[in-house]
């Protein structure tokens, strides 16, 4: 990795006594947790920490800016649109479409800039106003760089139109032109030139244009030498400028705000048919001449220079270092990747540069309480590590309402992330059970197809029934539908409730066979058999014979199964003895009822029909 | 095509509602309210689409919506209604765990007003009835539902209808004393949660619901327990369904899949069946899929309940120009429609029926 270019900045944590130098920290996905500690070996007494709070330190504050949020949202729409039309981008229209996308991005940046500028003017607090203004200049620089990249890398303007694009570029970014000379430099002559050039794509070839320009240049030179303008020094220097005389141009340094304005003006008058590959020579010399050894190039200058040198990787690298947020480099790199300009050399961690930048950007979005939804789409378009990153991030989104949970689940289901669906549904189902919302808990386990949890919820219902003697939430149990098949316990619950319903409707024979099948088919849990057998008692005691002999035998077998399997108790205590007593009484009653029923059933079945 | 204005507002919009215009007035809607969600500080904002712009050459109004004012809101904004109140009811919805005395607050998921009564439902399965001038709830039905109640609407004044997350519609009559619903309707089969409900403005027995699978169902609450029509609509949860208040043959739905659909069941205009429309609109024809149609009282036939498939075609139009993140909410009033999305944008159109 490269070495840092400068000293790391020191950030003071408010409230923490930094002279004591006792802090602990831990890294998070996009931030750091810091708090004050006090490890004091000498004194044993308890000291109250000077600062009893934990601080979250974030490097990226842009995500929290209200105005920049619009940038993130709008550019997300453009990004997703670009990925979607990728397959349709073929042939000649491809370049035009990509240029259109680039212009869309730039217009979004400009809109943000405008709004922030308005806010900066309207701000009452000067510190706030300064902050907004600096934000405006950062956005302006971003747009400047993007525009240049669009001209050089996406539009790939050839010699000829190249200069026109560069002229537009400079004009867009140079605001102060209030002097006649500056007017001439900025607007009048290019207009003359434009009529001279006509629009690109015409029948004039580059050589024709060059000849014409050469002719005009010679004429200017002749005028200068003849001394036509000797009477007016202004006109004379104007003529020199038009001849591309660098010294004359540099005299007007105050009007040319920066070296790239100087560069383009110089090219306009001396090398209007400059080829793209020659640009960097002129750029470097313009920069040197303009700075004149007084100041050193700023980061922005280096970035622009790298662009003129067609070193895309250097541009991206410098931008990454200079800007505090990954937004710019992520989107620009993605667009350049669509132009097939990035070599696919792999970085250290196995993914290419575009993917790395998108992952970083998207992770930053996930650290935001609200913009995480945008991050999902960015992860989708990272073929290697996107899915895995999404899986890790999406489980950690705090779910405060069901509505939010539903959205997160929908995202997971659309991408077949069954593990995450399961774990989220389980969390929500547990919360519901704790809040005694058994219906909700059941619907969450149905959504996750989680049989184990459905069993848990059913057990709760059955326990409630045993305690209270009646079912709660009948609206749910009565209407389970095919979801009943999710787990055996749930099926049992549904069928048991059906038994009660049949009993209530006095359809005793159906109720009886249902009850029996519940036990013989083994879906009833062992612990519940006693309850089921006790439910059978009233059926056995009815005047008419309900259980057939066969069924009675079955019931007796079940009872024996139950009683024989009972473990021997250890130390009996009073409660246990009482329970045992109740149990024994029940068993005896059952045995008696079963025997009586058997007798009646045998007699009934043995008799002739009709008797 | 209708002009639809989009504006990015730096907050995810969970609800939008037009401010009601006085009945019988010729004014069109010009103010709407929005609520945000998922922010550390949520806001309820009022926006105006009044004459801020200039008249363009067609005589239409230009300019997008402007913020009038906003206030902070604690928690996500789940539902909005307009009424004049002087009260605030906190802790209307809460969870209690068995055996413990503490209460945790539960999200309130829906609210509906019919001056002066206000009904709220929540994730705790509770229904509350408030009056605008009373401090305490007039009536509370605890544990009305074992699952989450997602939405509520008035059927007739003493009756409300709720939908829940196990796919049931329940009708509650406040004149009755018990805590049981007077009627339960549901679709057999998969218990798909229902998220939204709206009643036909003129025919109080016709109700439309939208579910988690994006299915639109039309119900007749007098007839049986099954829906009259099931229409496969969206690919993801349908968040809101609205009948147009003055043109009830038109229905609007919006969904998590990022689309907003206009369902036109009016059968009178033959040119509507033409396939030649201006660009940007995709029109699909769909026949009703009928299930379980009992004998409908013939004198009052709503186009939504009609049985003749050959005669009744519904034209469906998608109103948003590009696919976006989830459209969470929409509202229609007269020729105006407003909707809000998770992409932090609000869309407004003033020429719905152009």
What positions do the PLM features span?
Chain B
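Canonical WD40 repeat/beta-propeller blade segments in eukaryotic WD-repeat proteins
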Residues: 11-21, 75-82, 102-114, 146-155, ...
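Short C-terminal beta-strands that terminate individual repeats in beta-propeller domains
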Residues: 5-7, 69-71, 99-103, 139-143, ...
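Solenoidal tandem-repeat scaffolds enriched in leucines and small polar residues
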Residues: 114-192
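Short coil/turn segments within WD40 beta-propeller repeats
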Residues: 39-44, 96-98, 109, 124-128, ...
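Eukaryotic tandem repeat interaction scaffolds
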Residues: 180-244
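Terminal intrinsically disordered, low-complexity extensions flanking WD-repeat/beta-propeller proteins
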Residues: 1-78, 88, 237-238, 245-251, ...
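Short loop/turn segments that connect beta-strands within beta-propeller blades
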Residues: 50, 132-135, 174-177, 221-224, ...
């Amino acid at each position: 990795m490269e070495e840092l270019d400068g000293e790391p900045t020191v950030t003071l944590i408010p409230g923490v006594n930094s002279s004591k130098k006792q802090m602990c920290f831990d890294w998070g996905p996009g931030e750091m947790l810091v708090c004050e500690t006090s490890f004091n070996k000498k004194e044993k007494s308890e000291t109250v920490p000077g600062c009893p709070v934990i601080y979250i330190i974030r490097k990226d504050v842009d995500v929290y800016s209200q105005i920049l949020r619009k940038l993130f949202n709008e550019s997300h729409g453009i990004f997703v649109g670009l990925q979607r039309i990728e397959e349709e981008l073929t042939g000649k229209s491809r370049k035009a479409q990509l240029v259109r996308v680039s212009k869309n991005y730039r217009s979004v940046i400009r809109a943000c800039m405008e709004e922030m500028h308005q806010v900066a003017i309207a701000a009452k607090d000067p510190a706030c106003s300064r902050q907004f203004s600096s934000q405006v200049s950062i956005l302006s620089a971003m747009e400047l760089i993007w525009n240049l990249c669009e001209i050089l890398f996406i539009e790939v303007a050839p010699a000829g139109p190249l200069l026109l694009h560069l002229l537009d570029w400079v004009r867009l970014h140079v605001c102060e032109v209030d002097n006649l000379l500056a007017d001439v430099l900025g607007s009048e002559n290019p207009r003359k030139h434009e009529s001279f050039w006509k629009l690109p794509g015409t029948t004039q070839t580059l050589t024709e244009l060059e000849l014409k320009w050469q002719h005009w240049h010679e004429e200017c030179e002749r005028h200068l030498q003849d001394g036509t303008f000797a009477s007016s020094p202004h006109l004379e220097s104007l003529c020199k400028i038009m001849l591309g005389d660098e010294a004359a141009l540099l005299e007007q340094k105050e009007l040319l705000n920066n070296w790239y304005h100087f560069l383009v003006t110089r090219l306009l008058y001396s090398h209007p048919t400059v080829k793209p590959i020659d640009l960097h020579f002129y750029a470097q010399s313009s920069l040197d001449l303009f700075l004149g050894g007084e100041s050193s190039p700023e980061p922005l200058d280096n970035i622009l220079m790298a662009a003129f040198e067609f070193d895309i990787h250097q541009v991206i690298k410098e931008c990454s270092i200079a800007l505090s947020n990954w937004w710019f480099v992520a989107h620009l790199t993605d667009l350049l990747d669509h132009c097939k300009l990035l070599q696919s050399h792999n970085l250290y961690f196995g993914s290419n540069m575009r993917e790395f930048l998108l992952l970083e950007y998207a992770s930053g979005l996930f650290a935001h309480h609200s913009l995480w939804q945008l991050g999902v789409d960015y992860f989708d378009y990272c073929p290697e590590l996107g899915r895995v990153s999404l899986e890790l991030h999406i489980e950690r989104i705090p779910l405060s309402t069901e509505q939010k949970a539903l959205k997160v689940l929908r995202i997971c289901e659309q991408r077949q992330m069954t593990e995450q669906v399961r774990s989220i549904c389980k969390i929500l189902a547990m919360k519901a059970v704790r809040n005694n919302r058994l219906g909700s808990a059941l619907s969450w386990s149905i959504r996750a197809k989680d049989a184990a949890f459905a069993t848990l919820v059913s057990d709760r219902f059955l326990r409630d029934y045993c305690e209270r003697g009646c079912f709660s939430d009948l609206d749910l149990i009565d209407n389970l539908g095919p979801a009943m098949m999710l787990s055996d316990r749930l099926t049992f619950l549904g069928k048991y409730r059906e038994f009660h319903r049949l009993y209530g409707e006095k359809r005793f024979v159906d109720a009886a066979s249902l009850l029996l099948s519940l036990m013989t088919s083994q879906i009833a849990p062992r612990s519940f058999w006693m309850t089921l057998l006790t439910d059978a008692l009233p059926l056995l005691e009815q005047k008419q014979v309900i259980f057939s002999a066969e069924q009675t035998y079955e019931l007796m077998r079940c009872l024996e199964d139950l009683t024989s399997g009972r473990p021997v108790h250890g130390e009996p205590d009073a409660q246990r003895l009482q329970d045992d007593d109740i149990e024994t009484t029940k068993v005896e009653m059952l045995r008696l009822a079963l025997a009586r029923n058997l007798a009646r059933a045998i007699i009934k079945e043995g008799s002739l029909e009709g008797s | 095509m209708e002009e639809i204005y989009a504006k990015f507002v730096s907050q995810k919009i969970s609800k939008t509602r037009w401010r009601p215009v006085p009945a019988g007035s010729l004014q069109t809607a010009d103010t709407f309210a929005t609520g945000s969600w998922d922010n550390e500080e949520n806001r309820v904002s009022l926006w105006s689409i009044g004459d801020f712009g200039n008249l363009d050459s067609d005589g239409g109004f230009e300019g997008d919506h402007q913020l009038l004012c906003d206030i902070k809101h604690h928690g996500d904004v789940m539902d909005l209604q307009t009424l004049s109140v002087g009260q605030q009811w906190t802790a209307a919805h809460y969870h209690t765990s068995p055996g413990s005395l503490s209460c945790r607050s539960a999200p309130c998921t829906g609210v509906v007003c019919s001056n002066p009564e206000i009904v709220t439902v929540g994730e705790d399965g509770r229904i509350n009835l408030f009056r605008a001038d009373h401090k305490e709830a007039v009536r509370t039905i605890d544990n009305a539902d074992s699952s989450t109640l997602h939405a509520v609407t008035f059927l007739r004044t003493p009756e409300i209808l709720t939908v829940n997350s196990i796919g049931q519609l329940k009708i509650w009559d406040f004149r009755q004393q018990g805590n049981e619903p007077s009627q339960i309707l549901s679709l057999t089969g998969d218990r798909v949660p229902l998220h939204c409900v709206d009643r036909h403005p003129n025919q109080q027995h016709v109700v439309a619901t939208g579910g988690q699978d994006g299915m639109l169902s039309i119900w007749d609450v007098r007839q049986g327990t099954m829906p009259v029509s099931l229409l496969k609509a969206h690919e993801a949860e349908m968040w809101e369904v609205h009948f147009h208040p003055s043109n009830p043959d038109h229905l609007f739905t919006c969904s998590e899949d990022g689309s907003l659909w206009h369902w036109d069941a009016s059968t009178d205009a033959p040119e509507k069946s033409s396939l030649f429309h201006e660009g940007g609109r995709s029109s699909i024809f769909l026949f009703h899929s009928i299930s379980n149609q009992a004998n409908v009282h013939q004198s009052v036939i709503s186009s939504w309940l009609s049985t003749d498939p050959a005669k009744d075609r519904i034209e469906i139009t998608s109103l948003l120009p590009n696919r976006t993140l989830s459209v969470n909410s929409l509202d229609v009033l007269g020729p105006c429609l407003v909707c809000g999305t998770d992409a932090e944008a609000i869309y407004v159109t003033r020429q719905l029926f152009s």
